[in-house]
């Protein structure tokens, strides 16, 4: 998971 969980799917 990235810290900006909005884009963490790509």
UniProtKB/Swiss-Prot annotation:
How its function is modulated: the record gives: Activated slightly by Co(2+), Ca(2+) and Mg(2+). Strongly inhibited by NaF, Fe(3+) and Al(3+), less so by tartrate, Cu(2+) and Hg(+). Not affected by EDTA, Fe(2+) and Zn(2+).
Q: Which reaction does it catalyse?
A: a phosphate monoester + H2O = an alcohol + phosphate
State the top-level EC class.
Answer: hydrolase
MF GO annotations: acid phosphatase activity
Question: How does this protein's activity depend on the pH of its environment?
Answer: Optimum pH is 4.6. Activity decreases sharply with decreases and increases in pH and is absent at pH 8.0. When pre-incubated at different pH levels, activity is stable between pH 4 and 9.
Entry keywords, A to Z: Hydrolase
Q: What is its EC number?
A: 3.1.3.2
Q: Which GO terms describe its biological process?
A: dephosphorylation
Q: How does activity depend on temperature?
A: Optimum temperature is 50 degrees Celsius. Activity decreases sharply with decreases and increases in temperature. When pre-incubated at different temperatures, activity is stable between 20 and 50 degrees Celsius.
UniProt miscellaneous comment: Has no activity towards sodium phytate, ATP, ADP, AMP, glucose-6-phosphate, fructose-6-phosphate and beta-glycerophosphate.
Its quaternary organisation is:
Monomer.
Query: What is the name of the protein in this document?
Result: Acid phosphatase
């Amino acid at each position: 998971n990235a810290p900006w969980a909005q884009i963490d799917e790509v």
